[in-house]
Amino acid sequence: MSQNDTNHESVEEAVFKYVGVGLEKSGEDDAVNKQKSVDWFLKEQDQDQDQDQDPGRDQDQEDNAKHRDANDVSAVAAAAVAAALSVKKRGRPSEQSSTGSSGKGSGSSGQNNKKSKKNKNKLHLAAVDPELASLDDNLVDGNDSEEQSHHQLVHKAIMDTDNIASQHPDFQQYLNTEDDQEPKKEKSEERSYGDLSNIDDHVDDVSVSGSIPSQVRLKKTAEVLPKVLSSESHNDDQQDDVSNLIQEAAAKASHIINPATQSNGKSFDESEEEALEQFIKEYQKIRGLSRRQICERIWSNERRKDDFWTNICRVLPYRTRSSIYKHVRRKYHIFEQRGKWTPEEDAELARWCAEKEGQWSNIGKVLGRMPEDCRDRWRNYVKCGPNRAANKWSVEEEEKLKNVIHQMLDNASTAYEDGEDDEMKDSSTKIEDSGDADMLDVQDSDKKPSISNSKKKPAAKDIINWTVVSEQMGGSRSRIQCRYKWNKLLKKEALNKIKNISDDDKFWLLTKLRDMGFTEDSQVDWEELSTLMPGRRWTGTELKLLYEKVRTTVRQYKRKTINVICKELVGYPEASLPLDDEIRQHHSGDDEDKD
């Protein structure tokens, strides 16, 4: 076997053993490894110098190569990888110098493509380790296919090693700290050189410039390389563990709620408060957050890929996401006060709204109050200023209010017939809820199912923009005053109409409510329900008032669900109910208007 074959087998063996199982033994005995590596390097240098003088020593070199152990091979590969890292960090000076020398030596114009490709490969090997590029110098074009196959395999392994080293952050960290620790490296090298005091000077110089720096890095490199294979999977496992803990906390908190007594009402009961509180405390422990930090997380406007809102909604799965979102933000707010507004605060709110009306998040931060509180205070009380009347509504004001709202409803009806209702509703919502979009980043995915599959006409409550109504009233009444007054007028009119409702219509309503299986009054869309009645003789408001009056005849109706109440009422003979006296009594109690 020739010297070239020996060198090829050594590089191949070194690369694969270093990347594979050979690395496991690299740290067992550092002192022995260092000495063996140094001895081997010096021995190879002597063989290179004496090769031309004594060709008969090839057989001895071949025998010596067969006895080379795994640690020697690991040292060679470590030197190759360390050299590649150093060259990559410093801008590959070896590649530049190799390119320059190659250009000088190949000045003939008759160089073919095959030789040019071969030189490029040698240059890349020189970038990994300058010593590797010289291994092909003695190869001839007549090499057999097996030798070329080995050469290509070694070349690919070296390229893969270089890519791994350049891409992984742990190697980059190792390189970044290499220059900062130069004094420590010099001391470490001096300790390694102490064992070479009996070596000839010219051999010692070669050793210091070549093998020793690679050996000094061997241990550090051996400690870094395993992270290439395990760091990413370790981080993924850690994230999965945290996510599992949070999901378990949500499931545990949800068990506090009794499914038989769960409520869809507007207010959260004590058990729901307890369940939410328990989950948030567990989330704080898992994430290591303080009370202030969890409040800041809840009020963060950033759209994070976070598991907080997803899991807290699992605690109360029967509630909408937006209701949980708003409730939690109100309880875990980051603002200083939520008490009664003082005249000074109203004046400051007016000053800020004159500049930034609609930017409720910014205004809330300045005033130290929740954005929703600032918005409602401005729209309902402060906006009208001294023009807002606080006395009883006059007949002229009532008529003006009716005209404004009827005109708005007529415009909406025309837009609906022309197919423009979606645009109209979007515009109304944009005006009414201006400033809310920057506070709400949780969308409802559990909307109530529609009673009918057909496209429904928008209800009056979805059309009327009370801010616009207040403005068209000349600012003499706030939006909340206009809304309360309108609802009171509708109720008075509806109570007068349902005095003459037939028993058939009453029976139809109760049967429909019973069959739909509602458990809470808030689940009923009364306007949509009215569209299902044949002939549509009654509005949603009138049907709601009818049910509210009929249910009072059931004992302890406040403790029963709407489904149970309707089952009892349908069982009454001919659904005959004493409505007239109750309606007349209720109507007399509404004669006194309140602002």
From Swiss-Prot:
Residues 385-490 form the Myb-like domain. Residues 25-208, 414-456 are annotated as: Disordered. SUPFAM superfamilies: Homeodomain-like. Residues 114-123 have a biased composition (Basic residues). This is DNA-binding protein REB1. It comes from the Eukaryota. Pfam families: Myb_DNA-bind_6, Reb1_MybAD. DNA-binding protein that recognizes sites within both the enhancer and the promoter of rRNA transcription, as well as upstream of many genes transcribed by RNA polymerase II. It is essential for cell growth. May stimulate or inhibit transcription. Specifically recognizes the sequence 5'-CCGGGTA-3' or 5'-CGGGTRR-3' (where R is any purine). Residues 75-84 have a biased composition (Low complexity). Residues 25-46, 54-71, 182-205 have a biased composition (Basic and acidic residues). Residues 163-176 have a biased composition (Polar residues). Residues 333-384 form the HTH myb-type domain. Keywords: DNA-binding, Nucleus, Phosphoprotein, Repeat, Transcription, Transcription regulation. It comes from Kluyveromyces lactis (strain ATCC 8585 / CBS 2359 / DSM 70799 / NBRC 1267 / NRRL Y-1140 / WM37) (Yeast). One of its GO terms (molecular function) is transcription cis-regulatory region binding. Its main location: nucleus. One of its GO terms (cellular component) is nucleus. It is found in: Nucleus. Residues 360-382 bind DNA. Residues 434-443 have a biased composition (Acidic residues). The gene is REB1.
